[in-house]
Design a protein with these regions (language model features):
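Catalytic cores of nucleotide-sugar-dependent glycosyltransferases that transfer UDP/GDP/TDP-activated
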Residues: 1-342
Length: 342
């Protein structure tokens, strides 16, 4: 990880090149060593925004990128999330802005504090002596705040929803949950209103697929097809190698191999946080019911970051328990590895 600077969020202003500010307000965000899968708020969006910020910083027309998230001061999480500033690369910095209680909050609890975040950002940009050329907000909470700031500052705003409240409500209703239960747990009415506001005010809306545009955004009142841009997520090719002889992480291999009778077999690797939508139980069913797969390959399950299973979000231990029951039912001991990620 690059060095952190907790004492200053200032940087010398420059008139050369674009200044882009990215907002990703919920979850646990840091420059690297992401705790992906720790909870529902700390998932793929974290890596998406950090790698996007880093990639934007490498563009020759970009002078500066600030990734803005929430400052968290809470003994239950790493002290890194309390640092006011963290360097990602030469032109890219992560800034943590305090708003709401100091403790870690799930995204559903952040809505009452977004107006204060807007005030904090106006003060932040004033201290910089420079207003961004573009705001890019990720998820509904950031979209609501960025929409307000875009109107106040008179600058364009790009919105990426990542997931949408209307779609989530339909899925939960289909699972048999009541409207009252859904609203109490997920505050979807507030979220959908924020998404509508973001769609109304955004100059451009980024989706990952055409299906996302046609089957999800199209259900919104402020859906404007001309503003939609489909930009599939990129991939960091430096993470991959064709040198099969290199074993750069022997400790990782050892943690996976210790569960297996024959570690030399090819591996089916699955990485996901324990969530109903990931359909992990069906994966175990398919593997367990296939003698050919079991003969030819091992199965490895990397199920998100955790320090203590007793402190995980309530649904996650239940999912893990169901997976363990299936592993026992199909007698997969020695063929499946489920190490504790670190």
């Amino acid at each position: 990880m690059k060095h952190s600077e907790a004492d200053s969020d200032s940087a010398p202003p420059s008139s050369e090149g674009l200044y882009i500010a990215l907002f990703s307000l919920h979850g646990l965000v840091r420059a690297d060593r992401w705790e992906l899968g720790r909870d529902a708020d700390t998932g793929g969006q974290i890596r998406y925004v950090v790698e996007m910020a880093r990639a934007l910083g490498e563009h020759p027309k970009v002078d500066r990128v600030d990734l803005i998230t929430r400052q968290i001061i809470d003994p239950r999480v790493d002290e890194a999330y309390a640092h006011a500033r963290e360097t990602i690369s030469d032109k890219v910095a992560l800034h943590r802005i305090p708003f709401g209680p100091r403790r870690y909050l799930y995204k559903e609890k952040l809505w009452p504090y977004l107006d204060f975040f807007v005030d904090q950002m106006i003060a932040f940009f004033r201290r910089q002596g420079r207003v961004p050329d573009i705001l890019h907000a990720h998820y509904a909470d950031a979209g609501q705040a960025a929409g307000q700031l875009a109107r106040i500052l008179g600058i364009p705003f790009v919105f990426t929803g990542h997931s949408l409240g209307r779609v989530k409500r339909e899925r939960l209703l289909a699972q048999g949950k009541s409207a009252e239960e859904i609203e109490e747990r997920y505050a979807l009415r507030t979220r959908v209103e924020a998404e509508e506001y973001a769609l109304e005010t955004a100059s451009m809306v980024v989706a990952s697929t055409f299906q996302e545009v046609e089957d999800q955004y199209q259900h919104y009142d402020h859906y404007v097809p001309e503003r939609m841009e489909v930009i599939p997520p990129g991939v960091d090719l430096s993470s991959f190698s064709t040198d099969l002889s290199a074993d750069e992480h022997p400790a990782v291999r050892e943690r996976i191999s210790r569960f297996l009778d024959d570690p030399s077999k090819p591996m089916i690797l699955t990485m996901a946080r324990p969530d109903e939508r990931k359909n992990l139980e069906q994966l175990i069913h398919v593997y367990g019911q296939s003698p050919e797969l079991r003969e030819r390959a091992n199965l490895a399950l990397i199920l998100g970051h955790r320090d203590d299973i007793r402190e995980m979000a309530p649904a996650q231990p239940r999912i893990k328990q169901r997976l363990l029951v299936l592993i026992d039912t199909y007698d997969l001991s020695g063929q499946i590895s489920y190490p504790k990620p670190q």
